[in-house]
């Protein structure tokens, strides 16, 4: 009986995926930025201008739409926007 109860608890925790968060780099001017823990429904974003000038890293609800002179990389794994 104890084994069955323990098995149910383990399966419940695995199914709920408790406490998962996303870790992204964040900065304003110069990479690499500091690490920020974002909610699991967020995405990591890295945005830069052509020629590599001015790189911005942050967490967002959605991927940014780049202007004609920008490049954007969005991803959903830890530290992927470095």
Curated annotation (Swiss-Prot):
Expressed by the venom gland. One of its GO terms (cellular component) is extracellular region. InterPro entries: Snake_3FTx, Snake_toxin-like_sf, Toxin_cobra-type. It is found in: Secreted. Keywords: Disulfide bond, Secreted, Signal, Toxin. Its main location: secreted. Disulfide bonds join 24-44, 38-59, 63-74, 75-80. Residues 1-21 form the signal peptide. CDD domains: TFP_snake_toxin. GO terms for molecular function: toxin activity. Has been described to inhibit nicotinic acetylcholine receptor (nAChR) alpha-7/CHRNA7 subunits and to bind acetylcholine binding protein (AChBP) (Kd=29.5 nM). Negative results: does not bind to interleukin-6 receptor (IL-6R). Probably does not inhibit trypsin. Belongs to the three-finger toxin family. Short-chain subfamily. This is Three-finger toxin MicTx3. The lineage of its organism: Eukaryota, Metazoa, Chordata, Craniata, Vertebrata.
């Amino acid at each position: 009986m104890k084994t069955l109860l323990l098995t149910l608890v383990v399966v419940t925790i695995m199914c709920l995926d408790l406490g998962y968060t996303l870790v992204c780099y964040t900065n304003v001017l110069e990479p690499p930025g500091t690490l920020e823990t974002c909610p699991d429904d967020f995405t990591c974003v890295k945005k830069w201008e052509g020629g590599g000038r001015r790189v911005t890293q942050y967490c967002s609800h959605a991927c940014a739409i780049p202007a004609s002179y920008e490049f954007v990389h969005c991803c959903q794994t830890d530290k992927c926007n470095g």
